[in-house]
């Protein structure tokens, strides 16, 4: 919570630490190699809003839906796994034909297959059997393009 004078209580207030920058650099170089090889269709980092926002922006940009299961993405709480902005995380879309090549190119780095892209028109996120998010891509697009109505009603 942020109080009126800007003092932070609770979540936040600490600069993220990168304990092994050389590992992150090697991972980014491996990702760059797979991109240059034409293996990756698209990639998005999780630095501005975490996994959930990266997935939403990818669905909006491609006008595609996705079915994602975050089970296996860590032992932290769901909110941290969805919206955590920890360093060195990104979402990558590859065709099924290139999945093995991508995983081989990223060998030695933590990689989790989250789900599939589809034309269902919605982003669906689960944590195992627990549904977390089910939102239409068109609704996300309108919210992203639109403005907030701060008047409390129509003008």
Where are the predicted features?
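Short hydrophobic/aromatic beta-strand micro-patches
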Residues: 91-95
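Intein/HINT protein-splicing elements and their conserved insertion hotspots or analogous self-processing inserts
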Residues: 1-86, 96-155
């Amino acid at each position: 919570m942020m109080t009126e004078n800007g003092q932070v209580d609770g979540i936040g207030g600490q600069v993220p630490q990168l304990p092994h920058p050389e590992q992150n650099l090697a991972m980014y170089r491996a990702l760059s190699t797979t991109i240059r090889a034409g293996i990756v269709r698209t990639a998005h980092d999780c630095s501005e809003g975490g996994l959930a926002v990266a997935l939403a922006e990818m669905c909006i940009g491609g006008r595609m839906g996705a079915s994602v299961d975050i089970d296996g993405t860590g032992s932290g709480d769901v909110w941290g796994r969805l919206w955590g902005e920890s360093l060195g995380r990104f979402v990558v879309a590859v065709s099924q034909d290139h999945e093995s090549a991508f995983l081989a190119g990223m060998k030695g780095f933590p990689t989790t297959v989250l789900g599939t892209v589809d034309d269902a028109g919605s982003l669906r996120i689960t944590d195992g059997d627990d549904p977390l998010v089910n939102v239409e891509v068109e609704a996300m697009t309108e919210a992203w393009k639109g403005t907030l109505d701060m008047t409390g009603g129509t003008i």
